[in-house]
Amino acid sequence: MSGYDGGYSGGGGRGGGGYGGGGYGRDRGGDRGGDRNGGGFGGRSNGNGYGGGGYGGGGGGYGGGGFGGGAGGDRMGALGSGLKNQEWDINSLPKFEKSFYKEHPDVETRSDADVEAFRRKHQMTIAGSNVPKPVETFDEAGFPRYVMDEVKAQGFPAPTAIQSQGWPMALSGRDVVGIAETGSGKTLTYCLPSIVHINAQPLLAPGDGPIVLVLAPTRELAVQIQEEMKKFGRSSRIRNTCVYGGVPKGPQIRDLSRGVEVCIATPGRLIDMLEAGKTNLRRVTYLVLDEADRMLDMGFEPQIRKIIGQIRPDRQTLMWSATWPKEVRALASDFLQDFIQVNIGSMELAANHRITQIVEVVTEMEKRDRMIKHMEKVMENKENKILIFVGTKRVADEITRFLRQDGWPALSIHGDKQQNERDWVLDQFKTGKSPIMVATDVASRGIDVRNITHVLNYDYPNNSEDYIHRIGRTGRAGAMGTAITLFTTDNQKQARDLVNVLQEAKQQIDPRLVEMTRYGGGGGRGYGGWGRGRGGGRANAHNANNMPIGNRRW
């Protein structure tokens, strides 16, 4: 059996047929270079998945790949040049249902004053004409029983703010813009209405593409969305697939050819599939753009426009974003019709107020020692998880090696890691087997790991928006969190913006940081510090995750 023969066990589709059994991994199983000295991640394949060997041993390079971009991932450039925008005659297109919302009696009788009070309490603002009232309970949302049973099985106490307002908006069939912080529950805000939408459409015929298309910026976010879709679409036997770069195309092509109601995709790989004729978007009537701001930041706008040009214009479109910059507004005005909008929280760039922000002004040479001091305190609690952000892939590997040599079970994730290594690292971090993860900015969005208690900015990012996205990995879903930032004179030009963020969130501010705001320019040159300190060095840094852990400190 060739590994990936199927992969989505059970389930089947609304029209019958299952995904079959099968494993995960193709015949060749292991990672390139994984068998030079035995061991390594994957080793030699046994034909059934990740192959023998452990995630240790010598050798084993992790080249290639790409993480939401780069070689092996979503290539850019001329991508989509083979796609022609479709000409649509609306009158000749098959009609479809998209309006399913029926206001619950309790919602209907709720006064305007009560509605306004609810919106104020949840920092909710709306825009557009005839925006439906928010719902306050799951029952008020009016989902069919097959959806509600799955929701209640998860044990959620009540809808989140974005769900309260977003569900009636999405179920009404209108085009929707939702602005809310990461971790606010927006995935379910569009997932559950999509299930209702799918079940109101004709069954897929052979050769049909998906009914629901979700575009996401990174593989990790795409996989997270797929997990939610699987969970809540199970009772409706809705089939889905995840289409992203950095892995073999064969299994994704197989899923698409068998027929799926839902396709979750990164733009680059989806365009590959469309150009190769492996799927089409003629049946798409429910389009979701998730983390639209991040997709534009990553340069996907031309690809998004190419993809939307393949979809009928009377579709329902839902756009979700953590921020509302002019680039996202322009995309919304081009592709959404008479849309209604909900914003949760301030429209200004602001940090989550449940996060305690600690900013220390240090020299470059002091950073490693300060990081260790914080680690010792944080990891006193064995339940804690810490995500460490660095500026480059090289530093990610250097810091990971340094931490492992110092006795800390750290692993790194960045754009030069193969997809199966990234998946393994994420799983180790999620399960707490390795509670310390070092990441570049490419991981600052789209990775949904619950219960991250601490974020440490070893290197400060290029702008305050990325700072807010980074620290937003903690303090999610109502929890408290802590963000620690090591700030050097090299970051001086960012000082004023950072002080503004800290003041807005009513945080304590290091007087030395305030002092920096009084001087312009880029600050001093710092002290370098590459490969210094305990166990530094760059030799063989690409193999940092295989580095043996020294005398354990955790």
Curated annotation (Swiss-Prot):
Domain Helicase C-terminal: 357-517
Principal location class: cytoplasm
Residues the entry annotates as binding ATP: 180-187
Biased composition (Gly residues): 1-24, 36-47
Domain Helicase ATP-binding: residue ranges: 167-342
CC terms in the record's Gene Ontology section: cytoplasm; nucleus
SUPFAM superfamilies in the cross-refs: P-loop containing nucleoside triphosphate hydrolases
Major enzyme class: hydrolase
Motif Q motif per UniProt: ranges: 136-164
UniProt-annotated stretches for the region RNA-binding RGG-box: 519-540
Recorded GO MF terms: ATP binding; ATP hydrolysis activity; RNA binding; RNA helicase activity
Domain of life: Eukaryota
Quaternary state and interactors: Associates with polysomes.
Protein name: ATP-dependent RNA helicase DBP2
Organism: Gibberella zeae (strain ATCC MYA-4620 / CBS 123657 / FGSC 9075 / NRRL 31084 / PH-1)
Taxonomic lineage from the root: Eukaryota, Fungi, Dikarya, Ascomycota, Pezizomycotina
